[in-house]
Amino acid sequence: MKKLTFISCLLLSGCLAGAMAANKKQPIYKDAKAPIEERVNDLVSRMTLEEKVQQLNQYTLGRNNNENNRGEEVKKIPATLGSLIYFDEDANLRNEAQRKAMEESRLGIPILFGYDVIHGFRTIYPISLGQACSWNPQLVEQACAVAAQEARMSGVDWTFSPMIDVARDGRWGRVAEGYGEDPYTNAVFGVASIKGYQGEDMSDSKRVAACLKHYIGYCASEAGRDYVYTEISNQTLWDTYIPPYEAGVKAGAATLMSSFNDISGTPGSANHYTMTEILKNRWKHDGFVVSDWSAVPQLIDQGHAADRKEAA
């Protein structure tokens, strides 16, 4: 840069250079070296209400197998969307959706891709109930680690597993997804699964985030019917259904899934006692909770909300 003759010009140049540098300064939330809490607080402070609402939404991607329509699928995804249930194997489709979020949204928040990795991804293992029969949690941890690596290589960041519902009614149709009727067994294998999926560091390219489900009492539905009422006393809640979740949260589970069912009259997805008083206040869980499929609009059917706005 040429030496300027006049001091006034030199000062002006310095001011302009400083302003340009300030404009180019990276936001705290994009600084990988900054503490997580600072990055989160900075990002949230920049978000509009609409952007926050979009981050709470989850769409599906990849259910349309017609390749000619895949571009249309991506067009339907808001750039500010929070997460996708990813049903496909097309890396180009997945990457195009992510590119849209990163480049076409104001803040460039990446999409979280989730999938039901239950008992393996490409390599299939025995169902969870069968795994419990082995009483070999170390082997289950290894199996979940393999599933995590396969899923991550396919573009999945987050699995809706493990299911640790303490199921004691054989009529319930999802008994096979859990680890049986004993709270301790569910706790042990749930923790093993979490360790396998997440490892020591979820930023590892071979790991995925785990999700404890279904919080809570989903398996205790009347007559084993899905989506219906449960009558659970506080003692039964704590003696039978709480222990596996408490163990899973203490083991570092990144997320939980709220259940469809009422818990003695209050829907699981709108239950202040279980979601806030226990999970957040008592256990200090700092991850997030995802509702089960359409469980939030179902609050209308359960008589808990008048419309979708109130349900949300």
Regions found by a protein language model. Give the residues of each.
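Glycoside hydrolase catalytic-domain context in secreted enzymes
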Residues: 18-312
